[in-house]
Amino acid sequence: MKFLILALCFAAASALSADQISTVQASFDKVKGDPVGILYAVFKADPSIMAKFTQFAGKDLESIKGTAPFEIHANRIVGFFSKIIGELPNIEADVNTFVASHKPRGVTHDQLNNFRAGFVSYMKAHTDFAGAEAAWGATLDTFFGMIFSKM
């Protein structure tokens, strides 16, 4: 059964076309230099995500946005996401790393869906997302589908 799930995950990641991958990478290149803005959008979309981080729990998002700890954490998250985008379609190891660190923390599917929504909202506001929406949809469906199958 585990082999079947692994095979399906690999097939899903491999199903991304070269054009989809190129489109996603090009649009992400336009925003990856704003990790604080991306993390802010995600936390704003779902404060329960921010509450999962002990250094931010119970704090006002507006007051921590410009702080060094927030910037450091934003760089980590967006850096990891940059790694995933750069390695498309070969993301199985990154998915395993993500699941290994997030499953024990009790991260829910709803929170991951809300992370996705916050990220997409940021992309729509900062890029020509309409031209990349189908490629992003396929990529995010693949990424989160792989995660959900393991969590």
From Swiss-Prot:
One family name in Pfam for this protein: Globin
Gene Ontology CC entries for this record: extracellular region; hemoglobin complex
Record key words, sorted: Heme, Iron, Metal-binding, Oxygen transport, Signal, Transport
Molecular-function GO terms, alphabetical: heme binding; metal ion binding; oxygen binding; oxygen carrier activity
Keyword Cytoplasm: no
CDD domains registered for this protein in UniProt: Mb-like
Record-annotated Globin domain positions: 16-151
Binding of heme b, residues: 73, 102
Residues annotated as signal peptide: 1-15
Top-level taxon of origin: Eukaryota
Gene3D superfamilies: Globins
Subunit field text: Monomer.
Family stated for the protein in its record: Belongs to the globin family.
Misc note: There are at least 12 different components in Midge globin. The sequence of genes B and B' are shown.
Protein name: Globin CTT-III
Organism listed in the record: Chironomus thummi thummi (Midge)
